[in-house]
């Protein structure tokens, strides 16, 4: 950092050379001040505290950090089964947080796909893909929801994209 403070960083390979070595690396870190930052590689560095952890058990993706506990579900009425911040539950029922457009919602969705984009001690990023469905089971739109949690931060970043993948249906 410009002021001399060391900040933890994590890397995710974006492209590799034919021999398997990293060609392009996305480096993530939490900047706390504006200005020029310098990347220093130190292979002897131990993981930072606090850290964020991701585990998967029976279709449930559990994200734990020092401030947040979140469960992302592959099935059921809600994308999030649990959301707890600083020990305080933020969802009463799994369906309390849903994506909706008109009468279509993730509450009626039977199954969704969860993909791990990044999992490091510093940050966890998931991509949830599914459908907005009406009560009668009619699919109206597909969605892709990005979920991002950083160690040490009491916040969740959500970004959602909707897709109309049904030919001839608006």
What is each PLM-predicted segment?
Residues 1-62, 66, 73-78, 82-91, ...:
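Alpha-mannosidase-like glycoside hydrolase catalytic domains involved in N-glycan trimming
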Residues 105-115:
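Extended, charge-enriched "interface" segments that sit outside catalytic cores
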Residues 97-99, 108-109, 132, 163:
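Aromatic-lined carbohydrate-binding surfaces of glycoside hydrolases
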Residues 71-74, 116-170:
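Acidic, contiguous internal or C-terminal segments within carbohydrate-active enzymes
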């Amino acid at each position: 950092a410009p002021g001399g403070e060391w900040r933890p960083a994590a890397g995710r390979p974006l492209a590799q050379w034919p021999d398997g070595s990293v060609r392009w690396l996305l480096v993530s870190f939490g900047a706390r001040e504006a200005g020029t930052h310098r990347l220093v590689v130190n292979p002897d560095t131990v993981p930072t505290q606090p850290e964020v952890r991701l585990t998967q058990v029976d279709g449930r993706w559990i994200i734990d950090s020092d401030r947040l506990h979140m469960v992302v579900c592959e099935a059921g009425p809600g994308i999030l089964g649990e959301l707890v911040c600083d020990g305080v539950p933020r969802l009463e029922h799994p369906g309390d947080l849903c994506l909706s457009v008109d009468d279509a919602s993730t509450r009626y969705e039977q199954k969704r796909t969860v993909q791990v984009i990044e999992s490091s001690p510093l940050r966890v990023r998931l991509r949830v893909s599914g459908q907005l469905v009406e009560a009668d089971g009619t699919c109206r739109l597909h969605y892709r929801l990005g979920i991002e949690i950083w160690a040490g931060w009491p916040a969740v970043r959500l970004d959602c994209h909707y897709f109309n993948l049904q030919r001839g249906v608006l």
